[in-house]
């Protein structure tokens, strides 16, 4: 929930009578391609294209994959994912970020998707933050993107009620002095450092806006705490806030979850 207290104070289904060692526990397992720091998300009664209606569990990995699994059974046709998408393309120079690039061992051996995505049940859209390492013509960059995916197929939302996915996350002409070195442009603006910044807290959807927050990899400077707001329909950036305008650190922390 958006209050981040991790409690449902109006629970009516789970009770001490049905949550016990005899009737409650692990149902089955699925294999995925990387470590999972983000909390799995559940959406009920999802019409999967060509596969009928399912209760779905959505799982994000540090290998930059999103899986949609049937939440009730892994038998028969449900032994395979209902769909899977991946956001790397090694042949084109797009990979996850190796831990060796980061100067920190907080997450190993790679960094991709850490923050828990968020679902808009009205539009059937999954919003997810993805970090990649991209090498083009010998030049390396570290890129953060906000993706909006159709929960029924995993396809990017490029047009319609939710459009323009994906978008690159950045802060342009944000005023401040920062540390006064590589975290500024020398013209009074603080830079969003794609290598140093790490999306930690779960994404939040509130009043049609998607919120993303950032800290670092093991306090490797220069980094800042950032909070971004994007329109949930157009994916246009509508607001940016930085916690440390005249210094560094100030990260917005979480282990990848938040709910």
What residue spans do the PLM features occupy?
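Mobile, glycine-rich extracellular loop/lid and propeptide segments
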Residues: 1-259
